[in-house]
Design a protein with these regions (language model features):
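Sec-dependent N-terminal signal peptides
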Residues: 4-14
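Sec/Tat signal peptide C-region and signal peptidase I cleavage site
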Residues: 15-20
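Zn2+-dependent metallopeptidase catalytic core
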Residues: 23-44
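Post-HExxH zinc-binding segment in Zn-dependent metallohydrolases
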Residues: 41, 101-138
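Catalytic zinc-binding patch centered on the HExxH motif and its immediate surroundings
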Residues: 49-70
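Short pre-active-site segment immediately N-terminal to the catalytic Zn-binding motif
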Residues: 71-89, 100
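Walker B catalytic acidic pair
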Residues: 93
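Short alpha-helical functional segments enriched in proximate histidine and acidic residues
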Residues: 97
Length: 138
């Protein structure tokens, strides 16, 4: 019984570490793409993981100055979800940064359409999440 419990615990830890690694890989890849986008749009963007955000937000884009933004992802929330949430969240927040706009209006939607081209590796689940965001705004 003790052995079964030990094996079960190790299996759970292994699965958890693999899932966390997938989240980290998507985050690192997405953060690098965000830097390319920032360069193309002539803005500065810092992408960070944080342990919590106000009002249970999953992510936020904050203005730090003229042409300077910080994107924060609630990593506890993000890791509790599928790793398919990482890329759409980065696209959503980058659209706010490149438009210097905190609303979900046509300007933001147009930015989403432009930004998805930077993420050719998106799978259909991620693309569906982005489409749902756009549909809500339109």
């Amino acid at each position: 019984m003790k052995k079964l419990l030990s094996v079960s615990t190790l299996l759970v830890l292994l699965v958890g570490s693999v899932l966390a690694e997938n989240h980290n890989k998507k985050f690192e890849k997405g953060a690098a793409i965000c830097q390319q986008i920032a360069q193309d749009y002539n803005i500065e963007v810092e992408v960070k993981k944080v342990s919590a955000l106000p009002n249970n937000a999953a992510a936020c884009c904050m203005r730090k100055g003229e042409g300077k933004f910080i994107i924060k992802l609630d990593w506890n929330y993000t890791c509790s979800m599928t790793d398919n949430i990482v890329t759409p969240t980065l696209i959503h927040e980058m659209a706010h940064a490149v438009t210097n706009n905190c609303g979900h209006n046509q300007k933001w939607v147009n930015a989403i359409y432009d930004l998805v081209d930077y993420f050719p590796y998106m799978n259909r689940y991620e693309a569906n999440i982005v489409n749902q965001e756009v549909e809500k705004a339109e």
